[in-house]
Amino acid sequence: MRNIHLLTGKPVFAPMGSTANKHGRLIANNIMGLGEKFKGILGTAVVKVFDCNVGKSGLTESQAREAKFDVVTTLVPSSDVPHYYPTKKPLLLKLIADRKTRKLLGIQGVGPGEVVKRIDVLATGMSLGATIDDLPSFDLGYAPPYSTAIDIAAHAANVLRNKIDGIAPFITPMEVKDMADRGEDFLWLDVRSPEEYKEKRIEDPRVKLVPLGMLRRRIQELPRGKKIVTLCKAGLRAYEAQTILEGSGFKDVRIMDGGVEAWPYELKSEK
């Protein structure tokens, strides 16, 4: 049976046992004369692949573009609980939103961490027409065994807000890869530690390692007239580096979404 997608209003084929059971109840209610209508679906799906949890809800980036939304995305790696908690596990979220209406259009998540909780929360938000401005104010359950103080889903929404509002000039890994493949002349500024760099890194002659703590002392090594893309492990230090460079007069500095943890291409390792 085809359903109507809640975000596009168009028919969609997404067979799920959960949807079939909802249809069964709705049919029974209508047989009894209750006049109930099924509003539609988001195509939410989750699956466990060995030790990895995978989930999605709403539109993918390509589906959102095909539906003519003004698409903006973010990639946010994190742990599912605070970094100091012994049960922490990594996960990666991708959020898709519409730049004009600021409505959340989709979420995808992967990792050994608790992915499904985030999928369910944001699927609920999308069902109710939530915007990325609504999500950070959701009053979710918090304690260190279950979540970070600001949950990764809310953090991802905040990153999208910063993108749309021009607070932080992000660029996606795919856009950076396209720049590199076209042979563009830019500086890829890695602000992680030398140990992190040896463990895994992007192998490219445009990459320059300057740990964040040394950036101000070595800032004269950087070309002021060249585009600079900052990166770190997950994005925070890259953001700090961008603000340092912008404050020092650099004009064209971007932050790579999600850092090395969200880089979907080959990495070099010295392990």
Residue ranges and their predicted role:
Residues T19-L26, K117, V121, E240:
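Short amphipathic alpha-helical face segments that pack within enzyme cores
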Residues N29, G33, T124, T243-G247:
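Short, well-ordered alpha-helices that flank and scaffold nucleotide-derived cofactor binding pockets
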Residues R2-G111, T148, I152-A153, A157-D178, ...:
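Mid-to-C-terminal Rossmann-like scaffold of FAD/NAD(P)H-dependent oxidoreductases
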Residues G113-A130:
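A short, polar/charged loop-to-alpha-helix boundary motif
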Residues D133-F186, P194-V229, K233-K271:
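Rhodanese-like catalytic fold shared by cysteine-dependent sulfurtransferases
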Residues N53, G111-P112, L128, A234-G235:
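Short beta->alpha junction loops/turns
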